[in-house]
């Protein structure tokens, strides 16, 4: 019997927290579907979503200022359990009649939480026990405000040395507040606390499992497309691979795979992709030579957003042309949830576009093909779990992500054939050395970036002006936040030496040591 994987659902309202997407991932790990929406979303959307519980995220602002963000007032009147985290707790307390003040001593980092009332959220959870027999928890704090007076109906359920009201609860209305962050790994029992809220308080049934997601996706694809054919664009990445595999599992030979050789793929990538997909999918793969087409469309374009949109439009036009030849009506795409989040804007304009993904905001409005996006609700780690469950090879599943527009957005400014050739060689050297040194799977994504600037160097006995290559490697779980990878200096020196000596046009190599945020993973 097929499960309704969306029947039980949690809504997360985002107040601008760097951890908001992490909350969503934790809820998904518990086995319950959730969605992340901006805190200023309209009432109708929330009511249509019909959540079993609502989580208010943290945020960078202070509740004590009149113009700061507030939770929609009606959510406290609909009988739905609410959990406020950090800023979410503070705004809930303030909006329901409590008081919030700036603290004399901000709390950042580890703190020991003393549980005063373990009912519901903290039931059976402890890291240690105090001499008085009270449960103690190691938690992660990051706040400059505190709830100084509880709202009517609430009681303090936990405290720290610096926060007398570190957790609060109105058990009758099922409203809970946590001043700490249960979603981060620095709060070891955080997963269990969130599970208590989602499973026991909100009474959600954990149907969001890999097996059920696959079943639901197959059923959805079959219902949408019927007997019609679907065309799926292959890129060599995990997203398009899992998309193609799901579609093939759903409709068999109705799937047609298309690999567009844009000229912007990595060195030897076309041959590698064709080999992998024909071997493991057994599907028909059409390779379209579109190098001249993409280069012509990108000529003179230096703006990153324009490059992304042009790439998106050219991809769609190629697929439409192939679809007409084959009488195909559907396009399958590997859009994933972070693509949707990063490309979204709130209706009030408070959200900001970080970048447009070529398969989300970069699609032309007059597109003739109908879209099917089976991964649209999934984070990257969920996509990889699906791929393994579907039997795809681990080397493909854990291959580093590659952007749809390809090397066009790893070349700063205008794209031309010379720059592409230089970047392909530099990137291949970097990846080759990562694999030889067993660092490839220790980082989540690594690549080279071409900078169209010339820097002076010395080759032989002569001065030499050459281009600059930047190397980027990051570690991340969900690609929503990332840390730069602290690779050994000896390794970076070896890569730099090879690039400068093997690519005559390059005179300098630099390494990017910026986290996300403030930077994005890609340079453009």
Swiss-Prot record:
Keywords: ATP-binding, Glutamine amidotransferase, GMP biosynthesis, Ligase, Nucleotide-binding, Purine biosynthesis. It catalyses: XMP + L-glutamine + ATP + H2O = GMP + L-glutamate + AMP + diphosphate + 2 H(+). GO terms for molecular function: ATP binding; GMP synthase activity. One of its GO terms (cellular component) is cytosol. ATP binds at residues 235-241. Its EC number is 6.3.5.2. Residues 9-207 form the Glutamine amidotransferase type-1 domain. Pathway: Purine metabolism; GMP biosynthesis; GMP from XMP (L-Gln route): step 1/1. Pfam families: GATase (PF00117), GMP_synt_C (PF00958), NAD_synthase (PF02540). InterPro entries: Class_I_gatase-like, GATASE, GMP_synth_C, GMP_synth_GATase, GMP_synthase, GMPS_ATP_PPase_dom, NAD/GMP_synthase, Rossmann-like_a/b/a_fold. SUPFAM superfamilies: Adenine nucleotide alpha hydrolases-like, Class I glutamine amidotransferase-like, GMP synthetase C-terminal dimerisation domain. Residues 208-399 form the GMPS ATP-PPase domain. The active site is at residues 86, 181, 183. Catalyzes the synthesis of GMP from XMP. Homodimer. This is GMP synthase [glutamine-hydrolyzing]. It comes from Coxiella burnetii (strain CbuK_Q154).
């Amino acid at each position: 019997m097929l499960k309704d994987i969306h029947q039980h659902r949690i809504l997360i309202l985002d107040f601008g927290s760097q951890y908001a997407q992490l909350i969503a991932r934790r809820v998904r790990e518990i086995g319950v579907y959730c969605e992340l929406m901006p805190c200023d979303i309209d009432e109708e959307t929330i009511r249509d979503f019909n959540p079993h519980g609502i989580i208010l995220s943290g945020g960078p602002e202070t509740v004590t200022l009149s113009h700061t963000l507030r939770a929609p007032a009606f959510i406290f009147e609909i009988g739905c359990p609410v959990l406020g985290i950090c800023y979410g707790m503070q705004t809930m307390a303030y909006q329901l009649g409590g008081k919030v003040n700036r603290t004399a001593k901000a709390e950042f980092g580890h703190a020991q939480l003393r549980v005063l009332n373990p009912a519901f959220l903290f039931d059976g959870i402890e890291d240690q026990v105090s001499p008085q027999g009270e449960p103690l928890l190691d938690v992660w704090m990051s706040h400059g405000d505190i709830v100084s007076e509880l709202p009517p109906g609430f009681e303090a359920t936990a405290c720290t040395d610096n926060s007398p009201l570190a957790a609060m609860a109105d058990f009758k209305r099922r409203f809970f507040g946590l001043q700490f962050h249960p979603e981060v790994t620095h709060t070891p029992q955080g997963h269990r606390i969130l599970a208590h809220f989602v499973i026991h308080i909100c009474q959600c049934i954990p149907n969001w499992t890999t097996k059920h997601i696959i079943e639901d996706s197959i059923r959805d694809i079959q219902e949408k497309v019927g007997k019609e054919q679907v065309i799926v664009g292959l890129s060599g990445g995990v997203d398009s691979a899992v998309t193609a595999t799901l579609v093939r599992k759903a409709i068999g030979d109705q799937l047609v795979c298309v690999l567009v050789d844009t000229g912007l793929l990595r060195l030897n990538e076309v041959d590698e992709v064709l080999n992998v997909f024909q071997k493991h999918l057994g599907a028909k793969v059409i390779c379209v030579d579109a190098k001249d087409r993409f280069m012509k469309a990108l000529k003179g374009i230096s703006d990153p957003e324009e490059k992304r949109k042009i790439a998106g439009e050219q991809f769609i036009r190629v697929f439409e042309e192939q679809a007409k030849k084959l009488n195909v009506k559907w396009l399958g795409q590997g859009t994933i949830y972070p693509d949707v989040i990063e490309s979204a804007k709130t209706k009030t304009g408070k959200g900001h576009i970080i970048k447009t993904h070529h398969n989300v905001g970069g699609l032309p409005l007059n597109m003739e093909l109908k879209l099917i996006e089976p991964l649209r609700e999934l984070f990257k780690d969920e996509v990889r779990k699906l791929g393994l469950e579907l039997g795809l090879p681990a080397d493909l599943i854990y291959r580093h992500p590659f952007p749809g527009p390809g090397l066009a957005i790893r070349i700063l400014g205008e794209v031309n054939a010379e720059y592409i050739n230089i970047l392909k060689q530099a990137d291949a050297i970097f990846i080759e050395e990562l694999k030889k040194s067993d660092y490839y799977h220790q980082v989540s994504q690594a690549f080279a970036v071409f900078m169209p600037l010339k820097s002076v160097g010395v080759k032989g006995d002569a001065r030499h002006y050459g281009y600059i290559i930047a190397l980027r490697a990051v570690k991340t779980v969900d690609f929503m936040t990332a840390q730069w990878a602290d690779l050994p200096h000896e390794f970076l020196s070896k890569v730099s030496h090879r690039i400068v000596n093997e690519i005559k046009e390059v005179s300098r190599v630099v390494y990017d040591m910026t986290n996300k945020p403030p930077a994005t993973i890609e340079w453009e």
